[in-house]
Amino acid sequence: MEADRGRNNKVRCAVVDTNVLMYVYLNKADVVGQLREFGFSRFLITASVKRELEKLEMSLRGKEKVAARFALKLLEHFEVVETESEGDPSLIEAAEKYGCILITNDKELKRKAKQRGIPVGYLKEDKRVFVELLD
């Protein structure tokens, strides 16, 4: 189901994956703005994902390098949280710990999050955020 302007009061924060942050620049999608419209007010990123973006900024070229740089600038709107795990597991850990939705376009990560009872969201091809809230 598409998010209906934040009618589910249980989830007010979002943990966002690297692939979504890169997508924002490459596809001109206003993910943070859409999530705010849906009632989300807290945006988290794990320190592990921030480090991943910093590495990508140094190693990529062209549009992807600019996208990584843009994503790092976008993090001004995010709270960076520490986790015990690294990479994708850090996103699941943070979503569980803080009671957040996980926003990712990674199919495997979405599957793992759903198995653990974490609501997920992702970007559709038309640049809209699609949110699957749990009952």
Swiss-Prot record:
Return any one Pfam family short name. PIN_9
Going by the UniProt record, its keywords in alphabetical order are: Hydrolase, Magnesium, Metal-binding, Nuclease, Toxin-antitoxin system
Where, in this chain's numbering, is Mg(2+) bound? Answer: D17, D88
Q: Cite the InterPro entries for this sequence.
A: PIN-like_dom_sf, PIN_9, PIN_dom, VapC_family
| Cofactor(s), names only, from the UniProt record | Mg(2+)
What interactions and quaternary structure are annotated?
A: Dimer.
> What role does it play?
Toxic component of a type II toxin-antitoxin (TA) system. An RNase.
Write down what this protein is called.
Ribonuclease VapC9
